[in-house]
Every structure is written in C-alpha cells, then in structure tokens.
A protein has these predicted regions:
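Nucleic-acid endonuclease domains
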Residues: 1-21, 27, 32, 38-169
C-alpha cells in the first residue's frame, strides 16, 4: 500500500480508521492533511472531501466525522468559516506512469466540476497540475460555488422524480 511506502520513507502520521485523510504530517507546528489519488490523471475523479473543505475553510480540525448530517455540517461550516492559511492536500500518482507524481491543494485547484451524484465535486488531475494562487475569499467562493452547483444537480433529480412519481410523497 502506498501509505506504508510513504510511512517507511518519511515522517508522517497514519490516520485512524475512516479518517478524512490518508496521511498527515506536521512541519513547523502546522498540520497538513493529505489525500492520495491514484489515477490516470486524464479521467474525472470524485473528491469526497467534505471534511477537507471544512478544514480548509475554517482552519479547524473537524470535531465530527464524515457521517455528520448535511444540516449540522453546513451549520458548523457557516458558523466557523474564517480566513485562514490552512488547506487540504492531494498527492496525485499517475497509475500509468509512477514517475508522474505531483501535489495539489483544494484552495489552489484550477478546475473542479459539480457532481450531484457524488458530493461535493470532481476534478480531472491533468487540468490541475498548476496551482492557482487565490486570496482566501476567492478560494472560498470557488469551492462553495461548485459545491452549491453540485447540490443543485442533486436537488434537480429529486424534483424530476417527484414530478413523475408524486404519488410516493
């Protein structure tokens, strides 16, 4: 497993079971959570990172897990949203060329796409090789706008279903 190879060669922290990152490390007192993506880099991958979003937009390590309901999640996010320098990182490994390895971070992704079936959104890593430097407000708006677009897509499916199968409501 990739995490064990990294652990054997670098000073990293392994996560607890079902944690919101694949590994983390600390440098100069700062916490860096990292999600590993093994991909062709040319296909769209789901970014199931709602706790990574919380960390990047609040600067706080979540006190809850991925099972938190959406109402509580959005309430916590809105309440604790504040300018900060924290981010959620991705270690991208090209499965077709293991020499092709790069890092990206949530706030500096160049392009993300809404996905109503698998929140919060998707990314094609080949389109995210070059980080975009953003001020906090720009990064927050970039992330939350795409998240909102994904939620709208999810809601649309509900309304279409209800239109044709209203007798089930």
């Amino acid at each position: 497993e990739i995490t064990n190879i990294i652990y054997d060669n670098f000073s990293i922290n392994l996560p607890n079971a079902r944690d919101w990152f694949d590994f983390s490390f600390e440098e100069s007192g700062k916490f860096y959570p990292v999600n590993i993506k093994i991909t062709t880099t040319r296909t769209i991958d789901n970014l199931n990172c709602k706790l990574g979003i919380y960390y990047a937009l609040t600067g706080d390590i979540p006190s809850f897990n991925n099972g938190i309901n959406w109402d509580q999640y959005f309430c916590n996010l809105k309440t604790n949203l504040k300018e900060n320098s924290k981010d959620y990182y991705f270690l991208i490994i090209n499965k077709n060329d293991v020499q092709d390895i790069f890092i990206a971070s949530l706030k500096s992704l160049e392009k993300i796409s809404p996905n109503g079936n698998n929140l919060p959104f998707q990314a094609k890593w080949n389109e995210n090789r070059h980080p975009v430097q953003r001020e906090f407000k720009e990064a927050k708006d970039f992330i939350i706008k795409c998240f909102a677009d994904s939620l709208k897509l999810r809601a649309d499916a509900y309304f279409y279903f209800k239109r044709y199968f209203n007798e089930y409501f």
